Swiss-Prot record:
One of its GO terms (molecular function) is acetoacetate decarboxylase activity. InterPro entries: Acetoacetate_decarboxylase (IPR010451), Acetoacetate_decarboxylase_bac (IPR023653), ADC_dom_sf (IPR023375). The keyword Glycosyltransferase does not apply. The keyword Transcription regulation does not apply. Homododecamer. This is Acetoacetate decarboxylase. It comes from Chromobacterium violaceum (strain ATCC 12472 / DSM 30191 / JCM 1249 / CCUG 213 / NBRC 12614 / NCIMB 9131 / NCTC 9757 / MK). It catalyses: acetoacetate + H(+) = acetone + CO2. The record marks 117 as: Important for activity.
Amino acid sequence: MKQQEVRQRAFAMPLTSPAFPPGPYRFVNREYMIITYRTDPAAIEAVLPEPLQMAEPVVRYEFIRMPDSTGFGDYSESGQVIPVTFRGERGSYTLAMFLDDQPPLAGGRELWGFPKKAGKPRLEVHQDTLVGSLDFGPVRIATGTMGYKYEALDRSALLASLAEPNFLLKIIPHVDGSPRICELVRYHTTDVAIKGAWSAPGSLELHPHALAPVAALPVLEVLSARHFVCDLTLDLGTVVFDYLRQ
């Protein structure tokens, strides 16, 4: 294979059979359960990279079912998101995500910089209860519950929150182990169509794990529980801060 062909075909590894396809990345019937809780502000400050700033001492714990996604297929995901501000702009910082599908795991890390690891998340309805769980290996590290479709949510407020920017810390090492890329990335979700949205009483339980430390942001008080289904497009990102050029 000629050098020019290598350059033209270079998108993802392996060169001749990339682990994930090019976008756009459209998600249909994407289902969320989000438990928002109050936590220790010092715990957030210990994991939040500058120049992001904590908006408030809360965390959104997410369980997500994605049954129909372009190129990525059918999978589930779970993790923690922190409300932040960046130079006066309000948004969200994804601290950690766990999922059960290789293409979005590789694509999420390599393209955007999502902090993804392999895990076993689930989001299921058990009679009148929506139940989310996350196992890391044989260990259950998160369990969330909420009533099933108790009260309709304000869709305009939900759409506004989904339109806010999201921030990621993308880190890729050089071949000698030194940092090659260390960037703050901003991305948006677009073309959002909400198909249903509800609130209900909710609960969240987190358990310590050495390699999946979701419990490092402890649950002090559950503030809200939201369940919604939507279609959306996951746009590619832009670099807003380069740590290696400062």
